[in-house]
Amino acid sequence: KNKMNDWLVAEHQKRFNAPPDFFTAGGFAAASAALTALTKAGSSDTEKLIAAMEGMDFDTPKGKMTFRKEDHQAMQSMYHFRIKKAQAGEWDLLELVREIPASELPVPVRNKR
């Protein structure tokens, strides 16, 4: 959980009377990345945005993400969940087993700049 996620869930529920889906969080993350890059670059110039985004950290509903400098891949922690046997409510489905930090994920760099 984080403040951005809490806000997104509350606003989505208020506006659409339903929780956000997976795609909503992804779109929100993309918008957060764009806003962070524009703020950091101080410009909409392509080369300045590229320089600003390489290695840039930005907040998302799923936690911090980082654009890897080597290939511009967005990296984030992954979450290992277990489905709960006993659920306290309609959306009380998962139990977090562990968080796997992005730094521990062996995603190869194939397309170097």
Segments from the language model and where they lie:
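Extracytosolic ligand-binding ectodomains
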Residues: 1-113
